Swiss-Prot record:
Gene of this entry: Eefsec
Modified positions (Phosphothreonine) in chain numbering: 532
Organism of derivation: Mus musculus (Mouse)
Family annotation (CDD domains): eSelB_III, SelB_euk, SelB_II
UniProt name for this protein: Selenocysteine-specific elongation factor
Annotated region described as G2, given as residue ranges: 46-50
Region of interest (G4), ranges: 132-135
Composition bias type Basic and acidic residues, residue spans: 542-557
GO biological process: selenocysteine incorporation
GO cellular component: cytosol; mitochondrion; nucleus; ribonucleoprotein complex
InterPro entries in the record: eEFSec_C, eEFSec_III, EF-Tu_GTPase, EFTu-like_2, P-loop_NTPase, T_Tr_GTP-bd_dom, Transl_B-barrel_sf
Enzyme class: hydrolase
Length: 583
């Protein structure tokens, strides 16, 4: 290798049978370990079953002619297009600098190509659209068909971050997969030039702990076990120790190679093979390798959440999703929450979680398309329905995700929630949300040790009526509690009267759910007038005479109903189920 090669990773994504592997083969000059459908199962079925890697080398754009560091190594990551293998695509997208979306020009956007576009928006900054199989278009109408599909793709990309992305026509394998190799691919030289113009040399950071995403593991007789993958962070040198966290095993690096060339060190972004001894390759097909004790294994996590707009249906608390985190996809149960309503407009914090703040429990993720229209007599939306008061959306939302089995992952890693159990043949997006893992809960007993410190609350509202006045500072209330309710639990809580006074629940009154309310500031004359009813009793002369109700007779209702409102917070993870009111 003359000078150091600068490595960039280009993802080749698209719908099944769009010609991704043929395109990667046409572009490549050097085949990596797993490239070009080497898996027998994959060759038999004609689809890419796992991440295939290959590369080609071109002069570094802008480099001085003849300089020792003039080579740009473009590593192609051929992701499978088969719908049931979307887990693998998600794992691959996390190591991609630029994405090539391969479209069958005769079919246009299909279900998996749309999902790949969604993943690209989450995990990638740049896109090139490749219209493949142009050789299948009738020669006389070819350019018109290419122009028509180009316009369609431009319209598709209009509302994405990839608006204005370049679109190029090619024929990676003229005549189809069974055709002889005699006919040369079309448009590949132009595609390489386009990629060179689009690739910006990523800034690689050698600092931080070593972390590598491993996609294949195999043994070489007399050498040891080789793990191939892409370095996500940090650096590695010969003789360093690495941990395979899923197995809790630490091994020493015996040798390293980049595309069959021995190297002594490698850094973030490099495609690498690491050789270790006395390790069974069957124990690790895909996963993570890291500096010892640099990753954490978590049973639950606090994550930031952003809904994917193409996902139909709500994101509901207590729902289960397939959660892709690190290199694993596991089932997880979600609980959504947002800032307190007065903090909805605060600037989002993307790299940490503040346990000192209070958060509002949501029955579902809040988004504008889930906002209800106001109903008559309902001033505020029902928090249970997962809608914000007044239709106002918070700028940031979070979720507690509880995993069905522990996962090993880096801190602040990408998280994607999806519904991979949905019918793969329907034309719907199965990717539901994405976010960042802000805090992992490593303690198996996190429910007792951590969750009580997470101040997520529900707002509770109870409504009742004032039955009558006892004196200037006391009234009797009813219809707030059931007969069997232990009113003692509510003693000391404040209630608001519709006449404006504030009262405090003092004690139970009888056995029927009624209660006594103390009014510290006393009742106003207007309130007393409303609450003190009068009866008319006929005198002997037949004239109406006002009297007070006699003791023992049924008490009449106040002149007009006076309502009581009891509002309090109940913290979701408070084991004592306390009711809290703000001063």
């Amino acid at each position: 290798m003359a000078g150091r090669r600068v490595n960039v990773n280009v993802g080749v994504l698209g719908h099944i049978d769009s010609g991704k592997t043929a395109l990667a083969r046409a572009l490549s000059t050097t085949a990596s370990t797993a490239a070009f459908d080497k898996q027998p199962q994959s060759r038999e079925r004609g689809i890419t079953l796992d991440l295939g890697f290959s590369c080609f080398v071109v002069p570094l754009p802008g480099a001085e002619p003849g300089s020792s560091d003039t080579l740009l190594q473009v590593t192609l990551v051929d992701c499978p297009g088969h719908a049931s293998l979307i887990r693998t695509i998600i794992g691959g997208a996390q190591i991609i600098d630029l994405m090539m979306l391969v479209i069958d020009v005769t079919k246009g956007m299909q279900t998996q190509s749309a999902e790949c576009l969604v993943i690209g928006q989450i995990a990638c900054q740049k896109l090139v659209v490749v219209l493949n199989k142009i050789d299948l278009l009738a020669e006389g109408k070819r350019q018109a068909a290419i122009d028509k599909m180009t316009k369609k793709m431009q319209k598709t990309l209009e509302n994405t971050k990839f608006r204005g992305a370049p679109i190029i026509p090619v024929a990676a394998k003229p005549g189809g997969p069974e055709a002889p190799e005699t006919e040369a691919p079309q448009g590949i030289s132009e595609l390489i030039e386009l990629l060179k113009s689009q690739i910006s040399i990523p800034t690689r950071d050698p600092s931080g702990p070593f972390l590598m995403s491993v996609d294949h593991c195999f043994s070489i007789k007399g050498q040891g076990t080789v793990m191939t993958g892409t370095i996500l962070s940090g650096t590695i040198s010969l003789g360093d120790s690495v941990e395979i966290p899923a197995l809790k095993v630490v091994k020493k690096v015996k040798s390293m190679q980049m595309f069959h060339t021995p190297v002594t060190s490698a850094m973030q972004g490099d495609r690498l093979g690491i050789c270790v001894t006395q390790f069974d390759p069957k124990l690790l097909e895909r996963g993570l390798v890291c500096a010892p004790e640099s990753l954490h294994t978590v049973h639950a996590a606090l994550i930031s959440v952003e809904k994917i707009p193409y996902f139909r249906g709500p994101l509901q608390t207590k729902a289960k999703f397939h959660i892709t985190v690190g290199h694993e996809t596991v089932m997880g149960r979600t609980l959504f929450f947002s800032p307190a309503p007065d903090s909805f407009d605060l600037e989002p914090v993307l790299d940490s979680f503040d346990l000192s703040r209070e958060y509002l429990f949501q029955e579902q993720y809040l988004c504008k398309d889930s906002m209800p229209t106001a109903t008559e007599g309902d001033d505020e939306a029902d928090p249970k329905a997962g809608h914000a008061p007044g239709g106002h959306c918070p700028r940031q939302q979070w979720a507690l995700v509880e995993f069905e089995k522990p996962v090993t992952c880096p801190r602040l890693c990408l998280v994607i929630g999806s519904r991979l159990d949905a019918d793969i043949h329907t034309n719907t997006c199965r990717l539901a949300f994405h976010g960042v893992l802000l805090q992992g809960l490593e303690d198996k007993n996190y429910i007792e040790s951590f969750l009580p410190a997470l101040r997520v609350y529900k707002l509770k509202h109870k409504h009742g009526l004032v039955e009558r006045v006892m004196d200037d500072y006391s009234v009797i209330g009813r219809s707030l509690f059931k007969k069997e309710t232990n009113i003692q639990l509510f003693v000391g809580l404040k209630v608001q009267l519709s006449t404006g006074e504030q009262g405090i629940i003092d004690s139970a009154f009888g056995q029927s759910g009624k209660f006594k309310i103390h009014i510290p500031g006393g009742l106003s004359p207007e309130s007393k007038k409303i609450l003190t009813p009068t009866l008319k009793k006929r005198s002997r002369a037949g004239r109406g005479e006002t009297t007070k109700p006699e003791e023992g007779t049924e008490r009449p209702e106040p002149i007009q109903p006076v309502t009581l409102n009891l509002s309090f917070k109940r913290y979701v993870f408070d084991t004592q189920k306390r009711m809290v009111q703000t001063p």
